[in-house]
Structures are given as C-alpha cells and as structure tokens.
Amino acid sequence: MKVVITAGGTGGHIFPALALISKLKEKDKDVEILYIGTTDRMEKDIIPKEGIPYIGIEMKGLNRKNIFKNIDVMKTYFRAVKKAKNELVKFKPDVVIGFGGYISAPVIYSASKLNIKTIIHEQNSIPGVSNKFLSRYVDKVLVSFKESVKDFPKDKTIYTGNPRSEQIKDIEKISKTTLGFKKDKALVIIVMGSLGSLTMTKKLKEALPLFKNKDYQVLLITGKNYYDDYKDIKLSSNVKLVPFIDNLIGLMKDTDLIVTRSGASTIAEITSIGLPAIMVPSPYVTNNHQYVNAKSLEDDGACIILEEKDFNKDSLVNLLDKTLNDKEKLKSMKSALLKRGIIDSATRIYEEILKLVRDE
C-alpha cells in the first residue's frame, strides 16, 4: 500500500500523523509512505529525522486580521495545488490522509480531483478551517471528539479518537525519583505548552514561593523560551524547574495531577493515561477550541477548568490544595478520563483506511 500523509504547522497535527505512520509500518511491512508538509514549519525538521520521505510545498495560512493579504494566500494556494498534483501523480498513492494545518488543504483537494481516495482527521472539538473546507471533498472524516461528529457530513464521519492515544499506552513509566522527587509525596506537573507561555510565566513566578511547606511536590516545565525568566527565583526543596523533558509522557505516568493547556495532543495524553488535570485553555487559539476541548472533559467530570483570566497565584495554589486533598475527586477524574480515552485509536484508523482502499 502507498500512503501520502499531510499535516503541518503544530505538534497537534504532526504527532497524531506520526502515530498513524508508526501503526501503518507495524501492520504493513511493505507500506510506502510520503509525507507532504510545508517548506518553513516544524514538520520540515521533524519528519526527515524520523527517516520518512518528505516533500515541502510553500503554503500560507489565511490572514484573519487583514483580508487583503489573503490575495497572496490564494495565489500561494493555487501554486501549491499544482505542485501537490504533480507529486501525487508521480507517487501514485492508494490513499491520501490529512491531519490538518493549512498545507493539508491543497494536498487533499488535489488528491480528490485526481480521484485518489482521501481521509481527513480532526483532532480538536471545533473543526479547523482546512478540515471544514475539505470535508465536502473527502471520502471519510475521522474525529477525536464525539462532539465534533455533528460538524461534518453525517454519512462519512466516524469517531475514532486520536491515534496519539494508542502510541502513549506503550511508553514506559519513568519514576519521579529519577528527577530527585520523593516517592511517597504527590507530584504535580505544571506545563504550558512545549514552548511555554509569556502570559503564564509572570503568573507562575508569583505562585512558586507559595509552594513552600506544601505536602506535595511541583515540577514546573517552563519551556525553552522562558527558563531564564525564573533564574532569580529561590525555590523551596519540593519545587524543581526544567526547560523541557524528553520523555514527559513516561513521567506523567508517575504523576498525581497536571496543570496544563488543553490542546488536542494533551487531551489524547491524559485520557490515555488517566491523569487528573487542571486545564488552563489557551485563549489565543482559533475559535477558542482549547476551551471547548476542556469543557468536553469537564462535562464528563474528567478535568477541572481554570481559565487564564481567573488564574493567579492564589487561585492556582488553592485549587491544587483542594484537589490533592480530595482523593475521591482524583479517583473519579481518573476513571472518567480512562472512559473517554480510545486506546486503540490508531488501529481503528488503520482499519478505516483498509476498508476505503479495498472498497469495503
């Protein structure tokens, strides 16, 4: 089987795509994969390092602030369509699968016009612009949230979950003691995205001194961009700071509570692990989709939302104290998260691919 994968821009699109690629290689030793991404976003570095054949196509996203700039965007789009068609004709894939990001629009559209079978996967609870546009052209739409089924054509939409979830379950646990934390004390991880957050850095700096003498431990992952902002803070013995952690998933499996954003990949991670979470949705994303992601979990009793506008040193510490002291709440959140998680999601997507390719 020959498969083209397209996704770009952010880890929320790229890592689910990589999870599916891993499953494809596991199930079909002869599978041929081509990844089409952009020429200037993070996938251009990540994908080749994984040994996956990569083609970059120039593409720009829509400008929501200045619509006149979208004239150039449309010119770039039509050039990208032409380039994508040429690459697809050369590769001759059995199926083209898009995981979002604006590069997926010209690639999936081109595939549909060439009568190549097409699938898109939506990671968030609110569809992205590219996937909403593409849904009318593709053969199948796969979604991570049951709530988003209604946003796509009913006859072609299937709730499969996020393929990242299946990958996570196989990652080995890392003991918190490897980072110098005590085994018998609860651990809280605080992380505001892989790069960190400018707005949250100031709030978290003010909160750190309040963790002194608490009966739990705190690991703050600052993000590489903001680690130096904390250099003047004197830390108590139960608090540690790191710019990043290579295997965060493994450590999350020995963690009691996480304070985090609510992007699609994070949702996949905590539902797969069953890790109770205080979610601080980023208010700076399209359609406020992180809040909707988190609300979907909160409505099932699977997380607690603390909005950024309400986040300060006192609200954070008080909520941590309250939550960690409520063992029944932690237990019920863990149970609700595991019910939401689809830990065979990549396998489900693989099976949908086979059905489509075989015309079943």
PLM regions with names:
Residues K329-I343:
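A short, well-ordered alpha-helix in the C-terminal region of glycosyltransferases
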Residues I342-E360:
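C-terminal alpha-helical cap of glycosyltransferases
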